[in-house]
């Protein structure tokens, strides 16, 4: 079954207020159109802070933030003291997530917001000092800015190979894929299953 794609472009109207109203309506209409016919909706937003991205965030039930295993990428979440790994201040993105949570609560007139999860991406196969330091920093950060850590993905060639064919590791049992499973593939598929289980979608990976 192929997913339904619905691209949403930012409004080109000159008036900021009118453009924002148009963008908000475009996202709302897309969600309303897709929801009755689909079990899940994935909203992929750019890495920049703009109004359309904020609206997309506000419709989240689960917000997934992938993070390369690097202190350079950790700046996306917060500024960190290099000695203690304690947060010195939240990043613009973390502040945006907090603001969007409030926006969602106001729109839905409830205290319900969304589950913000951070997954480490392209981690090394062998444990390193950097990995341990990242783990410590993220553990301290999670309680400060309100996310939880979920299992991430290791650096694996199979992810890049399957991308070129438009496949995921969950497609490998499908007839016609012609890919022989090995232990590395099985380990990678388990990583996907662990992530899905962590966000409550484990039934879909059986």
Predicted regions and their residues:
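A generic structural signal for ordered alpha-helices
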Residues: 12, 34-35, 58, 62, ...
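Conserved catalytic-core segment of NTP-binding enzymes
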Residues: 46-151
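P-loop/Walker-type NTP enzyme "switch/lid" segment
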Residues: 1-41, 47, 82, 174-175
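A general structural-boundary detector
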Residues: 14, 43, 67, 140, ...
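C-terminal lobe/tail of nucleotide-utilizing enzymes
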Residues: 107-206
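Generic hydrophobic alpha-helical segments
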Residues: 27-31, 80, 191, 195, ...
